[in-house]
Amino acid sequence: MEERKLRFAIPKGSLEQDTLKLLQAAFYEVKGADRSYRPSISDREISLKILRPQEIPVYVQDGLHDIGITGSDWVLETGADVEVLRDLEYGRVRLVFAAPASDDSTSIGQFLERRLSRGLPVRISTEYLNITARTIAQNPVYRRYFGEMRPMIVTPWYRVGENEKVGIYLSFGATEAKPPEEADAIVDNTETGRTLEQNNLRIVEQIMESSATLIANKEALKDPWKREKILDVLSMFAGVIESRRRLHVFLNVREENLQELLSILPGLKSPTISRLAAPGWY
């Protein structure tokens, strides 16, 4: 009988190293990730595949993988129908609307108003076509000018949307380099904002925050064997995440100072106390 395996997609790129550290901390030994997209893992019931985080939500949705780690931004961008199991609390970035530093707009609405009121087109470069299109289409200023018309989404292969005055252009990277020649503004993720500043851009408005997220295929969760295995992985990750929030402090204290110390030490219920061999000490 063929051995069953849980198919686990992990992200390449900026999330990769922290993901490997999480797996290691959860007692999964991963080998070959630096030279193969199919690294080995110490759990024989799991198979790993390294993929771009942009791809993982749809592959998990379609059952090509049972679980995956990706950014919550890409779950939203793809609209994938997956079960979000847990925020893994690393890879935190902000998705922001940014414009040239010479523009002092304080909101997306103000930026749109200043251009549209002068009859100027709006060109936005981004990897996040759907999030950007929704954000712009729902903006009150945009709706006042164009109602229900959809912004034009532009890629090398297709154009969708009715409104050519507001174009959202697919970026294949180096998005911060697009303004002012190819774009009037961008939507991109940033951790510190330094790269934007170095390219003479400033943040106009934050759209969302994103972090690494564990997701699962909904059908896989209905399979008893896969569900149990997925919950095992989730439990191991949860243990690592919770342990990172806490400190283990070991100290010796005289018996007469014990109650005073207990009054200030935190714990899940109470600190663990052991009496030492020496009289009057813990």
How should these model regions be labeled?
Residues E45-H65:
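Short, structured active-site "lid" loops
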Residues A98-P100:
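Glycine/small-residue-rich phosphate/adenosyl-binding loop
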Residues M1-I50, I69-E83, D87-R92, D103-G109, ...:
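Small-molecule-sensing regulatory modules
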